[in-house]
Amino acid sequence: MNRFLTRRKVFVFCAALLLFSGNCTRVSRFVESADPYYTQTYKSVCDRWSQEARIHHGFELSLIVSATFESADFRRAYADEYAQAYQLTPAEKDQFMEDQMKAGRLGHEFLMATFVPETKWDDFDRADSMWKLLLVNDEGERVAPVEMRNLRRQKAVMSHFFPYITPWKSVYLVRFPSKTTESNRPMIG
């Protein structure tokens, strides 16, 4: 009797397996991991114009800074990605691209994300900040930012475009003048 129940269980299991696998198909190939970006070039261009630095005192982390220089090359790739992400019409995309290029002519902009372990140290946008930001060119000429703005409310949206932005980092837009103050020559290139 026990042997009969075992055969019956095997038969029921096989019948159920055949019944439920009738609509299944074999996977012929896997698709590569889904890239979160809509355009082919954005990630490589973003990586080319972005850097990260860390400051440690012994084993203690004092600062993480991630920044992207918003060059003309970056702005074109960003505008393409933005247009795809937000499904802009061709006219809207052209306007966004024009706005990006115009902003690039106002000065050298960087998007900067920072992490500091003490919230009181997160004062990059204050005039009396403990931090001093300077843009230094190949000739050693230095300029201070003409604008530094904390972008508090835009973090969730911006993390798609700047993957180093996390909930633990503060995000700033930093604009430097395009020309040196002493020689009035272009600061970069």
Segment roles from a protein language model:
Residues 11-18:
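Sec-dependent N-terminal signal peptides
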